[in-house]
Amino acid sequence: MDLSVLDRLKWLQQQQMVSPEFLQILGSDGREELKRVESYLGNNNDELQSFRHFPEFGPDYDTTDGCISRTSSFHMEPVKNNGHSRAITLQNKRKPEGKTEKREKKKIKAEDETEPSMKGKSNMSNTETSSEIQKPDYIHVRARRGEATDRHSLAERARREKISKKMKCLQDIVPGCNKVTGKAGMLDEIINYVQSLQQQVEFLSMKLSVINPELECHIDDLSAKQFQAYFTGPPEGDSKQSIMADFRSFPLHQQGSLDYSVINSDHTTSLGAKDHTSSSWETHSQCLYNSLRTDSVSNFFSLK
């Protein structure tokens, strides 16, 4: 490359600006500088020669074919423990000790809390086992359908059978009760029937008191047992015929009650002749209603 005049001048100026020491070094052979280095390290090179005898490999290093084995290790000399290091180790030991103490306290609290609950559970289990042991006083047998094995259930079954029999008897006595289904409806019909009988008896007693007030004293003296004995074994002969004649002579309503309108119309003519027969019939009819009433009521309350 051909340099211009200006480029040459710039290059010369740069070379002139270089330090004079560098120029001196370049101008000299360099012997003086080497002498300075030797004076710094020593004239006889004693220190450098000491490094020549330094072993290439340590005592613990193994050489294999001039190479250092990978398994070799450099052992450091043990360093003496100082007081500061001991304090640090003690602090590190105390920290886990405190943590273990806290854990032990928590475990103790948990055990204290679980002990009463475990005791309660054990008591409940003991009571359950004792109750199970005390319950079966009988030999438990698998019952078939419609049968029972317990004494209480057997007694309850017998009681229900008695109630059903008494209810059937009441159904047979009370008219129109066979059509009703259900015990509640049957009891309602029976109560209504007993109330109607009571009203009829009261009505008959009032009529008898109007016809002949002297009969009240005789009726009070008589008892229900005597009337029942009379109806179970009545006297034969004329008494039965007189009763049937008296029964035909008295007209009846549709409900079975006596029609006293005819008797009151002919009271002046026929009352004197049939006073004894009418009074006997009225007493017998009253006794009949009373006996029916007592039987129905006794059967009703025997169910309870």
From Swiss-Prot:
Domain bHLH: 147-197
Localisation per UniProt entry: Nucleus
Family annotation (InterPro entries): bHLH_dom, bHLH_ZIP_TF, HLH_DNA-bd_sf
Tissue specificity comment: Expressed in stems and flowers.
GO BP annotations, alphabetical order: DNA-templated transcription; negative regulation of innate immune response; regulation of DNA-templated transcription
Region of interest called Disordered, as start-end residue ranges on this chain: 74-132
Entry's Gene Ontology molecular function annotations: DNA binding; DNA-binding transcription factor activity; protein dimerization activity
Biased composition (Basic and acidic residues): 94-103
Main location: nucleus
UniProt-recorded name of the protein: Transcription factor BEE 2
Organism: Arabidopsis thaliana
